[in-house]
Amino acid sequence: KICTNAGGMNINGCVDGIRQWAEGNSMSGYKIGYVTGDNIKDKIPQLLKDGWTFPNFDYDGNFNDILDKIYNCNVYIGHEGIEGCLAEGADVVITGRAADSALFLAPLKYEFGWAADDWDNLARGIMAGHLLECGGQGAGGNYMYDWRNVPRMDELGFPIAELTDDTFEITKAPDCGGIICEQSCKEQFLYEVHDPANYLTPDVNVDISHATITQVGDNRVRIGGVKGKPRPDTLKLCVGYHKGWKTVSMLSFAWPDAYEKAQYCAEVIMKKMQRRGMKADDIHISYIGLNSLHLGVADMSEEALKNLNECVLRIAVFSEDKSECAKIIPEISPLQLNGPPGASFFGGRARVQEVMALWPTTVPRDAVQVESHILETNY
């Protein structure tokens, strides 16, 4: 059986694709389960009337300011709809924005018959899923501690969870590459967890503050001490809305004086933009290979700069006015010959792109009605 949130924002399209595949392979009676209810866009007006304000997790803002710009409103739902499909005999279950760990909790709860308020077992199921949900990341992928010594990363395996009565163990298939060790599990265990004593999920509030992670064999780690508390009364809601427009332009410069030339080129571009009267809401200038990731804490010392083989200038312009973002585009290409020496295109000609922003918030749990469905193929 397969449980997946591959439905995204087009669950029906995903279901239809699976149906066509199954019927194309003469699979009559194949049961496709699918879960609806995570899309609550049509419920937003009533929730606002009821007094729900949709506060933004990241910054102060008025939700009403984006109402006419909203594209999607999708809730992180839990395991219930998935379990419902399994109970109806589904061979595959498709969801939209279900929490990743819920995909693993649902078959565990269904198979073992855990009660809806068995918080400790639900928490164990969630954390087992949490260690599996990112695939190879739980078996040595994206492994910071000792990445050089991960065996056969080109054949990276996925982690496997084996549950006992009060613990669970993480391992992998023996013929796959990767590594399962205490440190690799710790990195994935804490991934996306802001408060170890209160890891909020749609299904349970998980407490891993006293959890144990112990190597018990080759590529085998035991997890114990995971506890659960009642689930939250709200669910996370991700609202996607139109924010504006952006243009990202890049030029690469070769040694010698790569950074100095890139920096001077940025000055030239900005002077040209001033003459064109560009009115941008934000302009971000960075240098790939130097500070595009580390920003203000990057090492920009003379020693770090003087022997660079190459440097890529990146200029990003953001505006609510699409035409303002377009002004920079025709000025980039000529600078290969009409600017500092040693320049070349990086990534092709720039284009104006729409910016879809995220409004992360919560919604009352009782405002979300999750439903399970079964479509049976008939070849």
Predicted regions, residues:
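Gly/Ser/Thr-rich loops at beta-strand to alpha-helix junctions
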Residues: 6-15, 97-103, 319-322
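C-terminal non-catalytic interaction/assembly regions of soluble proteins
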Residues: 224-379
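Short glycine-rich or small-residue beta-strand-to-loop segments that form or flank ligand, phosphate
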Residues: 1-8, 93, 312-319
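Flexible, glycine/charged-enriched surface loops at secondary-structure junctions
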Residues: 28-32, 138-153, 196-215, 272-288, ...
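A conserved active-site cap/scaffold subdomain adjacent to cofactor or substrate pockets
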Residues: 120-230, 246, 250
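Catalytic or ion-translocation cores adjacent to nucleophile or general acid/base/metal-coordination motifs
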Residues: 20-40, 105-146
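An acidic, phosphate/nucleotide-engaging active-site surface
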Residues: 41-95
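Hydrophobic or amphipathic alpha-helical targeting/insertion segments
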Residues: 1-32
